[in-house]
Amino acid sequence: MIWEVTKLRISMILSAIAILVLGFALIYGILGYFFGFSNAPLLITGALAFVTIFTILQWLFGPALIKSIYHLTEVDPTDPQYGWVYNLVQEVAMYNRMNTPKVYIANVPFPNAFAFESPIYGKNMAITLPLLRMLTPEEVKAVIGHEIGHLRHKDTELLLAVGLIPTLLYWIGYGLWWGGLLGGGGGGRNDNSGILFLIGIALIAFSFLFNLFVLFLNRMREAYADVNSAITVPNGAKNLQTALAKIVLSTDPDIIERYKKKYGQIGSMLLFSGFQINEDIPAYKVQELVEYWRNIKVSPFADIFSDHPHPAKRIQLLEKLTHTQ
């Protein structure tokens, strides 16, 4: 287990560094070539300041938008109906040696759980009503352990920082595209408006490529949150496996057969998702799907466009961790 956790942590750190270094190197090279390498740092600083301001505003006030979209209602320990949910979050927070975040119930018609934070709104966790009805309390604790992991690991801040790179590439590319479209200007290399136009398009394309790198980092972040649940919550690995299976089965009760007929076809790679849900799921189907995920070989590219790992990859990682509990 120690090696699995260490390998995942090192991979996340190296991936984040690689995205930042390669991104800034590409931006510096392009701007330096067209506007002079002495001017490139100033241009990068200006563009970075512009993008960072909007990113910080999103970070600071994003929780207010989340609360509105998900119709969140805060829960406290004395709540006669959902006080037990607060107690579960408090218990898992204690396992993780952190203060209990604010707990919310989300009145939306699909199973989901998520954590979010900002300096203004603090640490928060929300669980939707269908998820609470679908899972056992032990499975809910495992899900909470996953979400607490996101808070512990400062995942919001990590993604905002790394996400600056594709955003910078896009807006600089967009600016060069317009510069080329309007005829360049400024003398020297900048007279070649056609090159500016093409480089702008190339940078926009690179921004989408770097978004794939960010998705790769995000999948590791999700796996690391799974690990957090497995190592901090009693029986967290086993319970998170069955929770994931229940949530997937709730979107399509016959999904096992669909897996067998056409590999990899699943409506969503999100851990907690679905809209047409079935909350009454037979235990044998849960175990059958978990067993299926444990034994299939997943293509490295099965989740390349997803921000979550393929469910089978998650189950197989959690299965390794069950032997340590």
Curated annotation (Swiss-Prot):
Required co-factors: Zn(2+)
UniProt enzyme class: hydrolase
Localization: Cell membrane
Cofactor note: Binds 1 zinc ion per subunit.
MF terms (GO), sorted A to Z: metalloendopeptidase activity; zinc ion binding
Protein's membrane topology: Multi-pass membrane protein
Similarity comment: family membership: Belongs to the peptidase M48B family.
The protein, known as: Protease HtpX homolog 2
Species this chain originates from: Sulfurisphaera tokodaii (strain DSM 16993 / JCM 10545 / NBRC 100140 / 7)
The encoding gene: htpX2
